[in-house]
């Protein structure tokens, strides 16, 4: 038996180790091992983290419709799970590729037995969850309701598989800015005013399934250790390294100080050293027997600077005393306890002023809270820092110039580019991501963790392929590429401006820019809705959370602020049409609340009640210190003005829809009729019926131009009517301010014969319009009246443009100019 095991071990060592791509198939393959009914065995000596992961693996088998029972059996495929040094059966295999490795797993087969082996407890756990993932259980099965497809069978394809070692040693999340969303959801879900071990157990499982290993717990109003003593124990059992945030030194949560401020005294090390050292010592006493990481240094009380000055000597004294406490409490040299110093905001000034921490301490640099790396190690001395470098990165932020808390606004490309920049400059020891409430930051979390494990899997040119693969693995649908495109397009649009910074003044309403960006979102929402109908029912909640809701919410927000911009624009011109836009603002504001209500109360059966309670409409400064979302201000215009339209020139032109005349005169037995939806823009106008003489019929358009204009060009756009009367062409006249009328023959050359067929006829009928121009002299300032008189029946007018230097030829003749009535 020993010889057989030795032979197998040699085979394993010599076999080519593949990346853990696909070793599970759902179609029969020759010599593959069936998984419909399997057994799993592990050693009682193994880590508790491994046993918990095995229990989750059994549950995952059930989720996909398969069976995995503990123990061994002659029937079905057996799975052996174990960690080097903790499972004799694993040790006997002599898996050389695992020895001395960090968090590495190997999945292989020994004959007809599947083996999942890890170099340490997390390596084994990652191997277990890799099998779960390949069976179709996404890391997001619970946190985002990723669908799980039922299977009648699955097969393990024989071979040896691994993902190697992680590129970054410490890979974690920071729950932050947790009120009101996460706190509300926890209260609704777990019935507590804080995160207890039941909540954190779900967070830890997600981190491990994503091949992460670290957490900074929420700290605004919660105290991880004090709220529930089981929290820290649960982290240790499951194999998650705990840390505390950049301003919470010595394994103490800020709330542990804030709740007992009178007892501990001032957060001032120079004046209150004795009490603060005692506070620090208690934190190290609590964590000394764990893998937990210790934040060193000190900031001011409540995530603020200690003072206006950069007191290097004081910081040196603080760190020296903290290191002394670590050594005294643990009974080990200080460098045997992992420590980090965060160069966050003003703390970087200490570094720039020459302060240096001991060689073993991780140097944690930060982004600017908006996803841009502030600095990287540059000098040879910095690059060789033995403790290594880390990055603290944000996809959630509270602070100036404006909060970003509601939904994800981080572009995939920016995150990839900046994290690649960090990694390529040697920031490879620790990556920590500020994820706010965790939801709705699901995809940035996935991308961050995948990059922390192996940042070289993708390039900047094909990073969107990561998004496609993510949705393919989680949704399991053929539309994954389209889903990914919608997701990335939405990120691109949100990258233009965050929802908290968006308002009516963001885009230019006069140039049509506002309408363009609102239309961009409207088209994206239509795409997302069409795709929703094709998503399998079991995947729709996941699709709603990650794709449809963010698109709909932002599209609606754009509609609302566009409507506010139009209301302001038209109200200035005194136009009662401003009132319609004011009503649209109210409608969109109400829809926003309904979308959030649906997310909280209806989606996934109300499972995520509370996550969409973040205020996002009504910011006046960086923070959200207002009671609730506020309806944007609008202006109502009294609708008692004359019926006619008066236009205001803008940017060197006046653009007028033909139906918006100041006055109209019809001949006996006729009337001016508006044809809705006729033409390229809004409508068209014609004197009807065509069988009656036109007489003295006329349309008059009124507008204002700036002083000093001496000449202009009038563009008259009509339907491409042919000379059906055979009178040598339909004619109309154009006159400005009572000047001598100029006659325009609009269709004399519109005949399908040479020499006009290709030059005049085909272009006009293909474009469906005839555009003629008339040059006019401008003899006065102020208000002007342009009169157009048809000389033949059957002329259909669509648009009038008066150009005095600013009109740019466009297919739709520019957006209509502002007007009043």
Model-derived features: positions:
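Structured mid-domain segments that build the active-site/substrate or prosthetic-cofactor binding neighborhood
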Residues: 208, 213-216, 222, 365-371, ...
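C-terminal non-catalytic alpha-helical accessory regions
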Residues: 146, 150-151, 464-614, 697-699
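Feature activates predominantly on carbohydrate-active enzymes
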Residues: 98-270, 288, 340-344, 354-372, ...
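Contiguous, structured surface segment used for ligand recognition
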Residues: 20-165
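Intrinsic-disorder/low-complexity accessory segments
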Residues: 78-136, 198-202, 210, 249, ...
């Amino acid at each position: 038996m020993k010889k057989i095991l030795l032979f197998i071990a040699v085979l394993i060592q010599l076999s080519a180790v593949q990346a853990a791509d696909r070793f599970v198939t759902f179609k029969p393959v020759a010599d593959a091992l069936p998984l419909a009914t399997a057994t799993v065995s592990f050693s009682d000596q193994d880590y508790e983290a491994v046993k918990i992961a095995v229990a989750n693996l059994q549950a995952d088998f059930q989720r996909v419709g398969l069976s995995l029972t503990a123990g061994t059996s002659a029937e079905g495929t057996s799975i052996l799970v174990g960690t080097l040094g903790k499972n004799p059966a694993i040790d006997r295999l002599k898996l050389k590729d695992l020895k001395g490795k960090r968090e590495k797993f190997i999945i292989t087969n020994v004959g007809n037995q599947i083996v999942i082996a890890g170099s340490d407890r997390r390596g084994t756990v990652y191997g277990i969850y890799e099998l779960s993932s390949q069976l179709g259980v996404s890391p997001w099965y619970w946190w985002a309701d990723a669908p799980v497809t039922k299977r009648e069978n699955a097969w393990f394809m024989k071979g040896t598989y691994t993902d190697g070692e992680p590129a970054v040693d410490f890979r974690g999340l920071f729950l932050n800015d947790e009120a009101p969303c996460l706190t509300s959801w926890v209260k609704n879900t777990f019935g507590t005013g804080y995160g207890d071990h039941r909540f954190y157990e779900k967070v830890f499982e997600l981190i491990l399934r994503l091949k992460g290993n670290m957490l900074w717990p929420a700290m605004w109003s919660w105290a991880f250790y004090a709220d529930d003593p089981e929290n820290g124990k649960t982290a240790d059992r499951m194999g998650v390294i705990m840390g505390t945030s950049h301003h919470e030194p010595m394994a103490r949560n800020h709330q542990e100080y804030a709740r007992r401020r009178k007892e501990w005294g001032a957060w001032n090390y120079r004046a209150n050293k004795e009490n603060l050292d005692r506070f620090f010592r208690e934190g190290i006493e609590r964590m000394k027997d764990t893998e937990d990481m210790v934040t060193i240094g000190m900031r001011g009380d409540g995530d603020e600077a200690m003072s206006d000055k950069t007191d290097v000597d004081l910081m040196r004294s603080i760190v020296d005393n903290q290191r002394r406490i670590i050594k005294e409490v643990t009974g080990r040299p200080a460098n045997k306890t992992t420590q980090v110093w965060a160069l966050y905001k003003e703390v970087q000034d200490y570094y720039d002023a020459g302060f240096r921490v001991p060689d073993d301490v991780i140097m944690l640099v930060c982004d600017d809270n908006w996803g841009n790396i502030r600095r990287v190690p540059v000098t040879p001395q910095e690059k060789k820092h033995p403790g290594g470098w880390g990055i603290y990165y944000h996809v959630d932020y509270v602070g100036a110039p404006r909060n970003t808390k509601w939904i994800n606004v981080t572009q995939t490309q920016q995150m990839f580019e900046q994290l690649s920049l960090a990694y390529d400059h040697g920031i490879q020891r620790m990556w920590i991501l500020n994820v706010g409430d965790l939801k709705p930051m699901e995809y940035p979390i996935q991308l961050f963790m995948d990059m922390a494990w192996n940042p070289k899997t993708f390039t900047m040119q094909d990073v969107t392929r990561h998004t496609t693969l993510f949705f393919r693995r989680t949704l399991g649908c053929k539309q994954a590429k389209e889903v990914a495109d919608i997701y990335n397009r939405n990120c691109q649009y949100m990258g233009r401006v965050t929802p908290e910074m968006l308002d009516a003044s963001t885009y230019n309403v006069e140039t049509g820019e506002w309408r363009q960006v609102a239309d961009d979102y409207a088209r994206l929402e239509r795409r997302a809705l069409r795709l929703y109908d094709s998503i399998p029912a079991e995947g729709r909640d996941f699709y709603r959370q990650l794709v449809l809701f963010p698109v709909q919410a932002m599209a609606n927000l754009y509609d609302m602020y566009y409507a506010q911009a139009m209301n302001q624009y038209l109200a200035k011109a005194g136009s009662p049409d401003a009132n319609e836009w004011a009503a649209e603002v109210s409608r969109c504001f109400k829809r926003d609340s309904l979308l959030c209500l649906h997310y909280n109360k209806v989606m996934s059966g109300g499972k995520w009640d509370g996550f969409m309670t973040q205020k996002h409409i009504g910011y006046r400064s960086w923070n959200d210190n207002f009671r609730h979302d506020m309806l944007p201000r609008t202006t109502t215009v009294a609708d008692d003005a004359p019926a006619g339209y008066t236009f205001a020139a803008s940017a060197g032109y006046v653009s007028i829809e033909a139906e918006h005349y100041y006055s109209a005169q019809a001949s006996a037995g006729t009337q001016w009729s508006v044809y809705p939806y006729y033409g390229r823009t809004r409508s068209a106008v014609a004197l009807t019926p065509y069988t009656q003489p036109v007489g003295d019929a006329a349309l008059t358009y009124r507008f204002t131009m700036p002083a000093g204009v001496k000449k202009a060009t009038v563009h008259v756009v009509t339907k491409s009517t042919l000379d059906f009367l055979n009178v040598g062409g339909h004619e109309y006249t154009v006159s400005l301010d009572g000047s001598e009328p100029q006659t325009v023959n609009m269709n004399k050359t519109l005949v399908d014969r040479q020499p006009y067929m290709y030059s005049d006829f085909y272009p006009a009928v293909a474009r469906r319009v005839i555009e003629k121009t008339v040059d006019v002299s401008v003899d006065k300032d102020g208000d002007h009246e342009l009169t157009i008189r048809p000389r033949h029946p059957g002329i259909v007018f669509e648009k009038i443009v008066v150009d005095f230097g600013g009109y740019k030829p466009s297919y739709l003749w520019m957006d209509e100019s502002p007007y009043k009535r």
